[in-house]
Each structure stands twice: as C-alpha cells, then as structure tokens.
C-alpha cells in the first residue's frame, strides 16, 4: 500500500493537474456557483443563470461589436513610459511590463475602426486587467486619437469605460488627461458626430469626472459599479447610511444619471440603432436572397482574422 500511496497516487495527481487548465471553471461573484469557463466565454462572459456580467478583455469586446469580428487597430502615439521615475514597493516600469505581459496590450485603452451593421464607427475599450484600467498619458492619448479619427472619418465614437480612475504613478500628467479628453469630446460634438458611452463594471474615479459622463447617450451594463468616490468614503464623509444599490447601474438610471441599462447580449443592436438615429443614416437592408432560377449560390467566404492591419485605410 505504501508504494501505491506514496508513488503511484502522486504521479496520477500530477498528470491530472497538467491536463486540467487553470481556468476550467469560473466562480460567479454574485451567487458563488461554479460555471464551465467555455460556457461563460461563449455567452459573452455573462454567467448563465445569474446573468452576472463578468469583465471582458479589450479584444473580446471589440469582437462582440464589429461586423464579422473584424476591425483595424488604430496606431497610437508613443508616450514617455515613466515620466516621474516613480517607485513605491516596485518600479512603475516593472508594473507596466507585467501588465503588458498579462494582457498583451500596450496600455489600458485599445482603439479600433470598423463597421457596425455596415456603418463606420470608432470604438475605444478600456481593459480593467491593465492596471485597473487606470487613465495615464498613453490611455489619454488613445482616447484623444480615437476621437480625432472619428472626426476625420465623420463617424460615431463609442467608448467602453472600465477604470479605477487616474494613474497615480504619473501624478499631474495623469490628471491632465481629464481636460484633454473633455476638449476632444467637444471637438467631436462640433463636428456633428455622436459620442456614445457604455459604462461597464467598474467605472470610478477621474474618468467619471471627464469623458465617461459626457456621452450624448449614456448606457450602462447591468449591475455596473459607477461613481467618483467609493461608497465607504462617502458614508464616512457625510456620516449617513447610503441607500441599497447606491452607485449601481440601475440606481443611476432610476435617478437620471444614465439613459439606459442594456444587457450585454443586446448592446450591439442597441448601439447600431443609436448610431443610425443620431447620424440620420438609413437602415442597411440585408443582402437579397438569390432567385430560384439561379444555378448555384456563390461560395461563402470565411470570416477574416479578428485583428487586421495596424492603421485604418485613408
């Protein structure tokens, strides 16, 4: 028995560990139930049953919005990686390197240009997995460049906000991005193009004092935490108990801070409809079916790769 217990059984455990992916199961933060990862992924990262909206990566978000899951990555300007030579427990440059390795992103905001139900649109996505989606110089440049591109292309701009606020490691250079992005939003307005904001979980801090609350239409995902300061800080400041659901998407909708709360499965058609209404563009009809007299239908073309060239066409 000692040989079976001490040698064979540990080897079997090691084999099973190697064959089992670490993210095979996901625990729902709302109900605590374990759900198969692939079921959540195929459901746009919404937990089946509880409808809890998990965070989405920037690439997954862009795939869920653009036609045929295809878009052009917008080339973004380079900025100084560590302007203040900041260090706390670790060097800021090391934190940036780790975040880039973890997410595959250059910074917390990714911008894409593509088609949404046949119409051109620029979409910016904040990825919370990159240092909490914090707003620094690179993220601010990405938002501004996306808005400039929307003006150039004369098309709507959609931003998916998910952030813990300004990036403290960049100090006042991070805070400067609040007025810069606000001015860029005004530039888009003067060009007569729609600016649509989708608030996801969580959207807090400095971004709520700038571009995240300036949309022509404010949309929120169900249950998203949205606010400037945390609920505990507010309670300690005003010395009063806050109401249930305070700073959640549904509470903000009921009190006029957002226009609508939209389930993730309904976001794409909702955004397409809003873009058509705000640009007064006609609805694009589906391609007509071939006549019965046609000999053979054309061969279907496979969908292109998700990530296309690095810059949109002129």
From Swiss-Prot:
The record lists the catalysed reaction(s) as:
N(6)-carboxybiotinyl-L-lysyl-[protein] + acetyl-CoA = N(6)-biotinyl-L-lysyl-[protein] + malonyl-CoA
GO cellular component terms, alphabetically, are:
acetate CoA-transferase complex
Superkingdom, taxonomy of origin: Bacteria
Biological pathway: Lipid metabolism; malonyl-CoA biosynthesis; malonyl-CoA from acetyl-CoA: step 1/1
Transmembrane stretches in the record are none
Q: Which Gene3D superfamilies match?
A: 2-enoyl-CoA Hydratase, Chain A, domain 1
- Entry annotated with the keyword Transferase: yes
Q: Which GO terms describe its molecular function?
A: acetyl-CoA carboxylase activity; ATP binding; carboxyl- or carbamoyltransferase activity
PROSITE patterns to which the protein is assigned, alphabetical: COA_CT_NTER
What positions does the domain CoA carboxyltransferase N-terminal occupy?
24-293
From its record, what is one biological process in GO terms? fatty acid biosynthetic process
Q: Which residues form the signal peptide?
A: none
Q: Where is this region: Disordered?
A: 283-314
Q: Which HAMAP family match?
A: AcetylCoA_CT_beta
Role: Component of the acetyl coenzyme A carboxylase (ACC) complex. Biotin carboxylase (BC) catalyzes the carboxylation of biotin on its carrier protein (BCCP) and then the CO(2) group is transferred by the transcarboxylase to acetyl-CoA to form malonyl-CoA.
Subunit-structure text: Acetyl-CoA carboxylase is a heterohexamer composed of biotin carboxyl carrier protein (AccB), biotin carboxylase (AccC) and two subunits each of ACCase subunit alpha (AccA) and ACCase subunit beta (AccD).
Concerning its family, UniProt says: Belongs to the AccD/PCCB family.
Q: What is this protein called?
A: Acetyl-coenzyme A carboxylase carboxyl transferase subunit beta
Native source organism of the sequence: Nitrobacter hamburgensis (strain DSM 10229 / NCIMB 13809 / X14)
């Amino acid at each position: 028995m000692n040989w079976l217990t001490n040698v064979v059984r540990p080897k079997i455990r090691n084999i099973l560990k190697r064959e089992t992916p670490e993210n095979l199961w996901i625990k729902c933060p709302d109900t605590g139930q374990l759900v198969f990862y692939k079921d959540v992924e195929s459901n746009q990262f919404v937990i089946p049953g509880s409808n809890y909206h998990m965070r989405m990566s920037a690439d997954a978000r862009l795939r869920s919005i653009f036609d045929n899951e295809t878009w052009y990555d917008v080339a973004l300007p380079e900025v100084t990686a560590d302007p203040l030579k900041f260090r706390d427990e670790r060097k800021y440059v090391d934190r940036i390197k780790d975040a880039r390795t973890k997410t595959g992103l250059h910074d917390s905001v990714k911008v894409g240009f593509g088609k949404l139900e046949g119409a051109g649109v620029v979409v910016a996505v904040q990825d919370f997995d990159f240092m909490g989606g914090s707003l620094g110089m690179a993220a601010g440049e990405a938002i501004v460049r996306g808005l400039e591109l929307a003006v150039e292309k004369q098309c709507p701009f959609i931003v998916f906000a998910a952030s813990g606020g300004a990036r403290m490691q960049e100090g006042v250079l991070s805070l400067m991005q609040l007025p810069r992005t606000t001015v860029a939003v005004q530039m888009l307005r003067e060009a007569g193009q729609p600016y649509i904001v989708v608030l996801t979980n969580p959207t807090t801090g400095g971004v709520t004092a700038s571009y995240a609350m300036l949309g022509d239409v404010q949309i929120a995902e169900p249950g998203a935490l949205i606010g400037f300061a945390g609920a505990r800080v507010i309670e300690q400041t005003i010395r009063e108990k806050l109401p249930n659901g305070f700073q959640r998407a549904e509470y903000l909708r009921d009190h006029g801070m957002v226009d609508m709360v939209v389930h993730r499965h309904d976001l794409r058609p909702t955004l397409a409809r809003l873009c058509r209404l705000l640009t007064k563009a006609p609805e694009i009809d589906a391609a007509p079916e071939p006549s019965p007299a046609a000999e053979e239908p054309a061969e279907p073309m496979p969908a292109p790769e998700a990530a296309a060239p690095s810059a949109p066409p002129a």
